[in-house]
């Protein structure tokens, strides 16, 4: 039995996917049952990395999603539109969907999955998070007997590359970003990466799977890495930390134990933490569950090979079902998505965590005492408060707190910022507790 598929997009990931499908030797035998019937592209004249018959290429994307011979549509276009509309149109024509589009799933997942369940088709998205790291399927299947407590990940290779180079070279953000763009690791407009938006899309998806409820993308608190300086990285190193952009879904971090904390932000993590050694363009995801404890997933988070590997694994899953089932089998609950309720999400002000903060203060007697009093007025307990040195004639003071409610900490900073001796608060970074 041959299963015909159609691809929407033939960029880096699309080309990598076709390369795997055209070279089945030594891979899953199910690959030999797959025929690429159509590939949607913007231009028929553009040079390609892969060899495909001219009749396979088309600029008519709607013809692919409505073709009665095509059983699986692989969406690799990226972006919100027309990707969302084409996915929904394909579902309405009873096509199974494989996608690497985290932005569409994070924002329109409920709409897409409702349509898929209504029409009896699958929407699989292993490639949407973590590139080649198998994390979606383990959360849905292998870890199903666990009560997930937290998911903590380095989910964006661009920002991890930038922070890794800033750490190893002592370089500033702008300098490393420019180098990353020249090497092709960062886009000309890097906002989705460096502002944390890409990682926020991904943690919204993982949280939905891990905690068994829908997640609104706007409920993910999001901060990027533009404000992280070489100075902070150096001080973090002296304190026994490294700085990483973490995406966190935590069922235990807020005052309300029934609500999740969903957040993306630069974070100080101890050097002996499992994620501290995830460097360069690599991704890592640490899942904590009961009774398993901790399990970590690690690998290349982007690129043609890793992402195409995840795409093809989803295609193989669906092909296996099609070739071994009755004509209209019931959806496998381990592959489909059926939850209807939304996860309750706690506001970031209720987060309980530690903080690192750097102050530039006038070099006058009593300034450290005034800082300590300002924190004490709001119940903020300090782990350390030390004067590191001088910058532009100001005393540079670094504070690390014990666990504190974020709202209380921010109130303390507001009071402290009004002190005459406090000239600037350049950095406020959370510390992973």
Swiss-Prot record:
Its cofactor is a metal cation. Na(+) binds at residues 126, 129, 131, 133. CDD domains: ACT_HSDH-Hom. It is an enzyme of class 1 (oxidoreductase). One of its GO terms (biological process) is methionine biosynthetic process. InterPro entries: ACT-like_dom_sf, ACT_dom, Asp/hSer_DH_NAD-bd, HDH, HDH_cat, HDH_CS, NAD(P)-bd_dom_sf. This is Homoserine dehydrogenase. It comes from Synechocystis sp. (strain ATCC 27184 / PCC 6803 / Kazusa). The lineage of its organism: Bacteria, Bacillati, Cyanobacteriota, Cyanophyceae, Synechococcales.
